[in-house]
Amino acid sequence: MKKTLAALIVGAFAASAANAAVVYNNEGTNVELGGRLSIIAEQSNSTVDNQKQQHGALRNQGSRFHIKATHNFGDGFYAQGYLETRFVTKASENGSDNFGDITSKYAYVTLGNKAFGEVKLGRAKTIADGITSAEDKEYGVLNNSDYIPTSGNTVGYTFKGIDGLVLGANYLLAQKREGAKNTNKQPNDKAGEVRIGEINNGIQVGAKYDANDIVAKIAYGRTNYKYNEADEHTQQLNGVLATLGYRFSDLGLLVSLDSGYAKTKNYKTKHEKRYFVSPGFQYELMEDTNVYGNFKYERTSVDQGEKTREQAVLFGVDHKLHKQLLTYIEGAYARTKTTNGGVKTEKEKSVGVGLRVYF
């Protein structure tokens, strides 16, 4: 019998967790190890970076390792600790092709109850993560973090007591602060202060509904960023992300419309507004083979100043060779026109073939 798209999406989303190895299970305590190794071979060209010709690369694409420990207290109460690492070095640095330094991507603890919800503390995803429906493996054309941060140093609450419905709220705290020494390795009199341009604090609320072939999600966030060293004023970002979709289960097809709006309030400079709309689809071509794509139109404007319009399209095909082995081909093209006295047009295009091995 043909799998429903809902089952495929859930399976893909939880692939690494489903393949994790249980290394300890005793007296209500469960410890799992898992992750994936991901490689992509690509060709890319960008007038934004003044490239004269296409560049090819074979590099890391989101390889990760995680450890999760869960302890069940009884009566539905539990505690969980989670740590996930990533490779973070850029391909242009140290010739690493993104296989350089290893850092902690997520690290948090959770206290919860199946009926009352859970509280999460640490570096984690927020309720804004996963709001949009567009599928991508590498070249996603949606910049959700420009509207609402999707992760950070947070205290969050999530409620999943109603089938298909998730409610959540997050408070974001500062994460990136000045070190004891500056870039010249001299004592830094700003040590401990939030870095300019980084998150100072923020709040988010959101709701996600995914049941009965209907997908509806929305999140709102207000985030304050450090403005400068001269005063205590902040740069405030107010943003909304939303998606609305419908699954034609018999056809294995999901159609969706993602959208977002944000306004950045600057203390002494002009305010900035941005919005985007993005129709997309995901289609089960055959068992274990899926086709997906989306188009985006985004507009950014500064009060009585620069205006930017971007049109982008993404298309991809993935095939599961084994429950722990996924291959895909994906391409994206973006065209950006900036108007500020004159007109400047920039183009970016990328295509890649990737392989993921889960463990």
Swiss-Prot record:
Designated name of the protein: Outer membrane protein P2
Keywords associated with the record: Cell outer membrane, Ion transport, Membrane, Porin, Signal, Transmembrane, Transmembrane beta strand, Transport
Organism: Haemophilus influenzae (strain ATCC 51907 / DSM 11121 / KW20 / Rd)
PANTHER family given in the database record: OUTER MEMBRANE PORIN F-RELATED (PTHR34501:SF2), PROTEIN YDDL-RELATED (PTHR34501)
Location of the protein in the cell: Cell outer membrane
Top-level taxon: Bacteria
Keyword Transmembrane helix carried by entry: no
Gene Ontology MF terms in the entry: porin activity
Gene Ontology CC entries for this record: cell outer membrane; pore complex
Pfam families named among the record's database cross-references: Porin_4
Annotated signal sequence range: 1-20
The UniProt record lists the keyword Signal: yes
